[in-house]
Structure formats: C-alpha cells, structure tokens
Amino acid sequence: VIVPAKLKDSIPQMEEMGLTVLAVKPENQAGLFGAIELLAQATNTTARGEELEMAIDSNLAALAEAVAGTDAPSVYLAGNSSVLETAGPAMYQNTMIENANGTNAAASVEDTYWAEVSYEQILDWNPDYIILASDAEYDVDSVLNDAALADCTAVKERHVYQLPHAVEAVDSPVPASFLGSVYLASVLHPEQVTEEYYHAAA
C-alpha cells in the first residue's frame, strides 16, 4: 500500500493488518524522484525507474533551456473544488509553476495542502494568469464570468486556462507531471514553447 507521508500516523494500524506500507512525499521534483526510486526498489524494477527518471530529467532540462531568459509571470493555480483554493510553495504544483518559469502568486501561503483564500486576496495578488487544476469541478468560463474577479489582470486579459486531464491529472505529483510543466510553459511562453512542442513531449 502506498500512502502520502502526511498519513504516517495511520501506518502502524495498516501494518497490524498485515499490509506492507510505503510512505512517499513527492511534493517537489526531488521528492517525486525519491518516490519513483522507492517504488522501483520495492517492485524490483530499479532499471525501469532509472529510465523513467532520466526521461523526465531530459524533458525538464529541455524545457528549462526553452524558457531561459524569459520573464516569469505570476500564476494563481486554482484547486479542484473552487477557484478560492490554491497551492502554496509546499505543494508539487509550485514546482510545476517554477519548471514553467512562472512565479507562484500564492508563494506566501504556509498551508501544506490546498489553502482557502478570499476573492480579496486573489485581487491583491493580481496574478497574470489563473490556471485551473486538471480535475477542477468548474470551468474557465465560470472564472472569466465571475464578477468578483473582473478586476483581476488574468481575467481582464483572458489569461485563464485549465490543465489537461485527458489521461490523468498532470498537476499531481505523478511521473507524467512533467507534461503539466510543459503545458503551463506553453501558456506562459507560447513563443518559446509552442503547441507543437507540447504535443511532441506528450
């Protein structure tokens, strides 16, 4: 059984039930690689794990080169349930924003999970872009038409997008999450990271 490290208090109970438990904390790139290595060792697939890490590393290195020297716009990454939820620096989504050469508008948030914020706070941050989570229960139009956000730069410029979700949530700490970084970079830096670039990476 694989559980997030934040649920470590429940591990002894699971082990008492005869379960083998692996705890992971993939909330940044190093943590994600650590989780891949742990699972590869546990499943005796170390070589495949190394190949996967190398592929992710290669894609992220190419992305970093593509966006090098560009300005880093501010990004508000909205959560699954509401536009009034966001990811702070303790979450993997922050790494994804940084990989795309963006700046997390919610960098001051201290929560280690999705943080609830107010409309006033979003307007105070005034992000250049609002990005909806892959599995958001609302859509881009609902944000663009939200009167409470009418004065936000991202809304005025119609810089509101949703991360892809055709196969899995690429804004989650999973191996395919590098595609979330590439997609986000294609939104923030379309001249450097074209739609063709994104589809080639995918």
Annotate each language-model stretch with its function.
Residues E37, N94-T95, E120, V182:
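Active-site phosphate/pyrophosphate- and oxyanion-stabilizing loops and adjacent acidic/basic residues
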Residues A66-T70, M96-E98, E120-D124, C152:
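Short, conserved, surface-exposed binding loops centered on an aromatic residue
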Residues T86-P89, D141-V143, P173:
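Short, well-ordered secondary-structure micro-motifs
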Residues A61, E98-A105, P127-D135:
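Short helix-capping and hinge/turn segments at secondary-structure transitions, especially at repeat
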Residues T86-W114, S118:
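Alpha-helical, coiled-coil/dimerization segments enriched in small aliphatic residues
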Residues D9-E85, A106-A107, Q162-A202:
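Extracytoplasmic substrate-binding proteins
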Residues V1-A42, T46, Y113-T153:
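Acidic/His-rich segments in extracytoplasmic proteins that coordinate ligands and/or metal ions
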Residues A147-A166:
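Long, aromatic- and glycine/proline-rich binding clefts that accommodate carbohydrate-like moieties
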